[in-house]
Amino acid sequence: MSAIFGEQLPKSSRVEYIGDVPIIEECPRDVKTLDGEPILLFGKWSYEDVVVRDPGLRRYICLKPVILPHTEGRYQNTRFGKARIPIVERLINLMMRPGRNTGKKHKAYNIVKRAFDLIYYKTGKNPLQVFIDAIINTAPREEITRIIMGGIAYSVSVDVSPQRRLDLALRWITEGARACSFNNPKPIEECLADEIIAAAANDPKSYAVRKREELERIAAASR
């Protein structure tokens, strides 16, 4: 069993292991309705042609077809449960910040739904694919950590795990949308759409792209 901070954590029955190493399987993509029709996100957007071009993130971006991205917290006490939550739901959950938005999931759901409509109107592309491309472009590959040797603290560069890469990308995308909408007449759904479009194009105007470049630059200087 894995030990974190000296504690033995039980293995999850939902996760397969090779020894002590967990195996994260990709979410199923062939889910259909009882009539054999494909399931569309928000009743509009197809999952079938969406491609995750980063092999390292492929197992952690859940693209299981769902109409309503809401799992009711069933994975909250499961190790690596975040990898089984639909990626759009994770975006919705992160839009429920800061504290005054806590619990307002229907509000966050409508923001993301309208943002995806705006992405389609502005790009003509499947907004789900644009969102996945934005995640890949903003997920950092290096960061820094502090180690203490001989009573002196050093910052050293380390590789970022796939799960943390995904966490940081989603966090920065939502932070960028909130920062854009603060004291701005532009609605937050338009800010979120613009942030995702800019990140998908790897545009430096994107808050998330700038944060990734800043972190990787600091990590490169600490090698």
From Swiss-Prot:
Annotated InterPro entries: Ribosomal_uS7, Ribosomal_uS7_arc, Ribosomal_uS7_CS, Ribosomal_uS7_dom, Ribosomal_uS7_dom_sf, Ribosomal_uS7_euk/arc
- Is Ribosomal protein one of the keywords UniProt gives this record? yes
Task: Print the keywords alphabetically.
Answer: Ribonucleoprotein, Ribosomal protein, RNA-binding, rRNA-binding
Gene Ontology biological process terms in this record: ribosomal small subunit assembly; translation
Entry's Gene Ontology molecular function annotations: mRNA binding; rRNA binding; structural constituent of ribosome
Q: One GO cellular component term, please give it.
A: cytosolic small ribosomal subunit
Superkingdom of this protein's organism = Archaea
**Entry's family note:** Belongs to the universal ribosomal protein uS7 family.
Write the protein's name: Small ribosomal subunit protein uS7
What is the organism of origin for this protein? Pyrobaculum aerophilum (strain ATCC 51768 / DSM 7523 / JCM 9630 / CIP 104966 / NBRC 100827 / IM2)
